[in-house]
């Protein structure tokens, strides 16, 4: 079974970007310590500093589900929820084939 890739595109209201970035980076740093998380990158657009991308690689769907229950993810997720319309998020799941 191929590894699971989650690509998340986040567009943040400019007034929230600097406040949200530390939570994103903390989530990423702690996520790669999880057994089933192989990679977690936070990428910022060169064209728009308020557009960020998460590139996450997990061993399988169970590892992703476990990730979503961790304290660091929940801290990030709750912050995103509090911002409401100040954050737009889309996510896509992929199979890693290379």
Tell where the protein language model's regions lie, with residue ranges:
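Glycine-rich beta-strand-turn "strand-cap" elements at beta-sheet edges
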Residues: 2-5, 42-48, 78-98
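N-terminal first-folded block
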Residues: 4-33
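Short, well-ordered beta-strand segments in beta-rich or mixed alpha/beta enzyme
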Residues: 4-11, 41-68
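Short flexible/disordered coil segments
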Residues: 8-9, 70-74, 96-98
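Short phosphate-engaging motifs
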Residues: 16, 50, 72
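Short, glycine- and small/hydrophobic-rich beta-strand elements in well-ordered beta-sheets
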Residues: 29-52, 94
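An amphipathic, aromatic/His-enriched active-site/gating alpha helix that lines ligand/cofactor pockets
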Residues: 30-38, 57-91
């Amino acid at each position: 079974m191929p590894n699971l890739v989650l690509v998340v595109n986040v567009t943040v209201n400019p007034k929230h970007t600097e406040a949200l970035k530390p939570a994103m980076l903390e989530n990423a740093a702690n996520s790669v310590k999880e057994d089933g998380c192989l990679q977690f990158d936070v990428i910022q657009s060169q064209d728009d500093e308020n557009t960020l991308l998460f590139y996450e690689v997990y061993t399988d769907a169970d590892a992703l589900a476990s990730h979503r229950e961790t304290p660091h993810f929940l801290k990030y997720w709750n912050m995103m929820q509090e911002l409401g319309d100040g954050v737009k998020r889309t996510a896509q799941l992929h199979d890693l084939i290379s």
